[in-house]
Amino acid sequence: MIKRHSILTAILLCFVAFTQVMAQEMQEPEPLPIDPKVRYGKLSNGLTYYIRHNDQPKDRADFYIAQNVGSILEEENQRGLAHFLEHMAFDGSRNFPNNGMDEYIESVGMRSGENFNAYTSFDETVYMITNAPVNKSGVVDSCLLILHDWSGFLALTDSAIQKERGVIREEWRTRQDAQTRLWEQQLPKMYPGSRYANRMPIGSIDVIENFKPDELRAYYKKWYRPDLQAIIIVGDVNVDQVEATIKKMFADVPAPVNPAKREQVSVPDNDLPLISIAKDKEASNTILYIFYKHDKLPNDLNRTIAGLVKDYIQQICASIMDERFDDILHQANPPFIYAQAYDDDNFMIAKSKGAWTVAALAKEGEIDSTLTTLVKETQRVKQYGFTPSEYERARINVLKQYESAYNERNNQKNDAYVREYVNHFTNGGYIPGIEMEYTLLNQIAQNIPVEQVNQYIQDMIGEDNIVIGLTGPDKEGIKYPTEENLLRTFLKARQMPVEPYKETVSNEPLVPTLPTPGQITETKTGQPFGATVFTLSNGIKVVLKPTEFKKDEIIMTATSPGGSTLFGTKDIDNLKVFNDVIEIGGLGNFSATDLSKRLAGKKVSCALSLSQDSENVNGMAAPSDLRTLFELIYLSFTAPRMDEEAYASFETRTKAQLQNMELNPMVAFSDSLSKAVYGDNPRASRLRPQDFEHISYPRIMEMRKERFSDASGFVFTFVGNIQIDSIRPYIEQYLATLPSQGKIEKGNPAEVPSTRKGDYMNRFNRSMEIPKVTVANLYTGQMEYNLENIITCLLYTSDAADDTPCV
């Protein structure tokens, strides 16, 4: 018997508990108000609009039109028309014939594809103009005019449609990657009886090549209409003027007469688990999913405080499950490479159904053990719930996230608001603003006990409405269970006895014994960029640069000359995993998992790394957690911790993940590219499973000691919301006491992999499921190493296809 209303029951019980504790009268909850900083309205023709002034960044704005229309609305003979129509929106309109839109966008300094784009998904189509220079004359009105034409005035000429068929055909071909082909196998099994089974946005190539132009125009007229559209403008604009322009400009968009009803496409319930197994020759990972489907909270409740309660509980449940999976990952031979749990209010691609989801990256040949572990951990929660200590950590972590968002409320970029408003229009929910959300979340977190959280998650983990998905490489020698065997394993695991979750959490100080503080021996103010520079009694230099960009963040970097080039060829394989391994054991008296739990509720991080020519420490903290950052820095230099079991887990998982990397054609391309550029230099080769035969964890920890036990030569830089008088005691206590022998080193340039000289061409063929060609052109030359060239190079590479640094 399928429990169709379990989520509604669970949420209402939590809501009742919350309101009773808050001593409120139980009545129909009111929708949360719209953020007063958002100008929200609806025209008489049904068009919705959101306008918000935001000067982060100054003189720039984003212009979006969201269509509550996607590929899910296509009939069988229309598959692909939603995406095709998206392309046609850039091929001429009433006010921008032919390539007029592209020409205008480029005339004001924007670029098509980067600032001028769109996407089509199953349930929505969204068009965007981003980072528009609204300080230039006429840009606001012109961008609104483009949105106006997108709304209902596309040209859709026969010639443009015919020309675009070839473009779409090529996009269809190039996007037929392993993930797409896996989905095409999976969706019919996961969504039987639903349109979601066969409505991939790219569509059917047969439809693309053969539909009649009038069919596209009919689809456009049927679905592109103001009652299914929202205009979203966020940026450095005059809200009153923009609203007035919208009301005037969009008044000629006709309201639909007898419009087709935009219904949510349903996903049928199922008594027995549905099984989907998909393989592909170019897939490189084995991934296992278990979906526990459930009905969604109705939108009239989701836009009230009940929706906020639901979202809070979902975050709590996912956080605790991920923490449990992380504990398992640190076992010597974990049953999976990685695992996570989540509930994002969707059942994979379907918006009409929710799903509590657990997923894992499985090791080759160990699908049964992965599935068994996922089921047992789920049943552990089903039977016993979460512990009070787990809930407390998750609770303060969630509150910290909201606190950080609240503290940074005046520094949000345009795209953060745009995403929120697009989601509000297409999915419903609430947008009261972070001020109200933060206030309400604090009340919710204080008044919902762990028992109510447990009741919610236990209701979500049902006995029916279950879907199991498995994807992996189609490779000789890899055996997969049949659907029957996978179901048998699932049902067997569900009957296995489980015990309540047990944990030990240490509350001891991070640094149990503090040394006598050192001193600041020299202070220089008025330095470049307005910085203050301290020289400490152990020779370390500290640079402080207060800024007001973010109120809730201080960023720390520390570097010292040296780096990986100081190690010889015998350590090359160790260097390949050095940065991944040196901190898996934790710090001081805390394992990595215990340290993570100890830092619950804190916005802080600190990590060591080794580059070719330097040792590096990177960290960040909220001002309230600054002391913790200094404690982590101190421990990183003075109290590294080895954990053989954690390393064994890392080796097992990494080897399993690397095992089928070569099946991905782009990995083969990357390997060939590296060899073309650097020849056979072993320092430029990627990690392979066989490299672990030469990797030694004890040796890596010795290497860490060589590079990080002596802080000589390190320069620490702190940038952010810094109060210099407040940070001084931490500097004296934790940095001025770091061991320092006064030894200053430099990297070894001779060991840096050099690029091939002269002209060189490497062509190679690779069998692919869908043949395509990839080309990379690289140019090398000499450049003076100075600040101007470094910044120029960073600006250049920020627009490149990758993030390759300038060296």
List the predicted regions and their residue ranges:
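Histidine-centered catalytic micro-motifs
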Residues: 79-87
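A common structural junction motif
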Residues: 148-155, 250-256, 377-385, 636-642, ...
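Proteolytic maturation boundary segments
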Residues: 22-51, 238-326, 330-332, 392-396, ...
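Catalytic Zn2+-binding segment of zinc metalloproteases
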Residues: 88-95, 585-586
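Non-catalytic, conformational "gating/processing" segments within enzyme and secreted inhibitor domains
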Residues: 153, 165, 179, 216-248, ...
